From Swiss-Prot:
The lineage of its organism: Bacteria, Pseudomonadati, Pseudomonadota, Gammaproteobacteria, Vibrionales. PROSITE patterns: AA_TRANSFER_CLASS_3 (PS00600). GO terms for cellular component: cytoplasm. This is Glutamate-1-semialdehyde 2,1-aminomutase. Its cofactor is pyridoxal 5'-phosphate. CDD domains: OAT_like. It comes from Vibrio cholerae serotype O1 (strain ATCC 39315 / El Tor Inaba N16961).
Length: 432
């Protein structure tokens, strides 16, 4: 038995399912999860000492690579001055100014501790600002585990085969309306049936929790137009796409200005940080300047702010945005080319520093219904073949994968060699 298997067995005694977030349990791919001991650059090392090229990146935050020396030093320096104060610090201002500079639609913002906190708070603010209760989200999109957002959700909820979670009262769920991603008509129908009742639309601008699905042409422009016509707010959940799809987020990439934006993952440089922000007049509704309450003991934590500030400053250096996108495109194109060579039907999507692939003969995958028709069993087999060859992909067919600036030509070539061998095995098995 491996050390990882021993740890997993031991963990299940005191931790439900042996993990602190469901997707880590490998339920989506089968088998026993690997337990990580350390990480550096593009590599993670498991409890048995085996190295893997990592395309999970802590589910997105490690955009510079693991254990970056500058971020590590920023954390050490901040920790020497104190771990938490529960009072304002100058670094919170500095960090907010930098985020607002990089994402100009966020004229004001509030720091929180996670993406879930950010989306939960943004929804509450939208309801308070508009005086309306209902919200629209999209089937297969995941916005954290707040009750009102666990309705036809993506991510781990899809892996469990249970998109709407038990424990969410019907009285909460009835205020959450679901539309089809990339389908403006489904959005218009909801507004027509709920005149003057919808506070906001919340959307992942690139759906990263049913793998990786970009918007079709005109989709975001249509959402912006509908919100303007109906007096609703448009919320971009950029927890995953923020600073990764482009330095200014997906809203910069697609040239759309949302009313509110939520951030997480990259903004903390590996520390637990989230943020929500947007138009000044909307943000003024948050306490203490307005009536909508939101608070957090550890919000704006000085160590987390130091890590996030160091990360974003490094990321904004000239050329990094293009380098990250180029690395990711090279990898995505390589996967597609190799799959074609081996006769494996594969559809690959890539936007900036995130990518995803679907084992399917469909020509397009644009929504949850398309994702549900993909070959999950073949993905499971491919995942374990790649793992055996030292490549760690997201352990779910419904999760996007991520590159970092630490992924060099050596790591990408090794990954494509592993993919070549894995596709060859899949092809041979299909003929057997």
């Amino acid at each position: 038995m491996t050390k990882s298997a021993e740890l997993y067995q031991k963990a299940q005694t005191t931790i439900p399912g042996g993990v602190n977030s469901p997707v880590r349990a490998f339920n989506g791919v089968g088998g026993s999860p690997i337990f990580i001991d350390r990480a550096d650059g593009a590599l993670i090392f498991d409890a048995d000492g085996k190295a893997y090229i990592d395309y999970v990146g802590s589910w997105g935050p490690m955009i510079l690579g693991h254990n970056h020396a500058v971020i590590r030093e920023a954390v050490i320096q901040a920790a020497q001055r104190g771990l938490s104060f529960g009072a304002p610090t100058e670094m919170e201002i500095t960090m907010a100014e930098l985020v607002s500079e990089l994402v100009p639609s966020m004229e004001q913002l509030r720091m929180v501790n996670s993406g879930t906190e950010a989306t939960m708070s943004a929804i509450r603010l939208a309801r308070g600002y508009t005086g309306r209760d209902k919200i629209i989200k999209f089937e297969g999109c995941y916005h954290g585990h707040a009750d009102s957002l666990l309705v036809k959700a993506g991510s781990g909820a899809l892996t469990l085969g249970q998109p709407s979670s038990p424990g969410v009262p019907a009285d909460f769920a009835k205020h959450t309306l679901t539309a089809r991603f990339n389908d403006l008509d489904s959005v218009r129908e909801l507004f027509a049936a709920n005149q003057g009742e919808i506070a906001c639309i919340i959307v992942e601008p690139v759906a990263g929790n049913m793998n990786c699905i970009p918007p079709v042409e005109g989709f975001h422009e249509g959402l912006r137009e509908i919100c303007d016509q109906e007096g609703a707010l448009l919320i971009f959940d950029e927890v995953m796409t923020g600073f990764r799809v482009a330095l200014g987020g997906a809203q910069a990439h697609y040239n759309i200005k949302p009313d509110l934006t939520t951030l997480g993952k990259v903004i903390g440089g590996g520390m637990p940080v989230g943020a929500f922000g947007g138009r000044r007049e909307v943000m003024q509704y948050i306490a203490p300047t307005g009536p909508v309450y939101q608070a957090g003991t550890l919000s704006g934590n000085p160590i987390a702010m130091a890590a996030g500030y160091a990360c974003l400053n490094l990321l904004r250096e000239e050329g990094n945005e293009k380098r990250l996108a180029a690395k990711t495109k090279q990898l995505a194109d390589g996967f597609k080319s190799l799959a074609d060579q081996h006769g494996i039907p594969l559809l690959v999507h890539q936007v900036g520093g995130m990518f995803g692939f679907f084992f399917t003969e469909q020509e397009t995958v644009t929504c949850y219904e398309d994702v549900a028709r993909c070959d999950v069993e073949r993905f499971k087999r491919f995942f374990h073949l790649m793992l055996q060859h030292g490549v760690y992909l997201a352990p779910s067919a419904f999760e996007a994968s991520f590159t970092s600036l630490a992924h060099g030509s050596k790591e990408i070539e090794a990954t494509l060699e592993a993919a070549d061998r894995s596709f060859a095995i899949l092809a041979a098995e299909a003929k057997a």
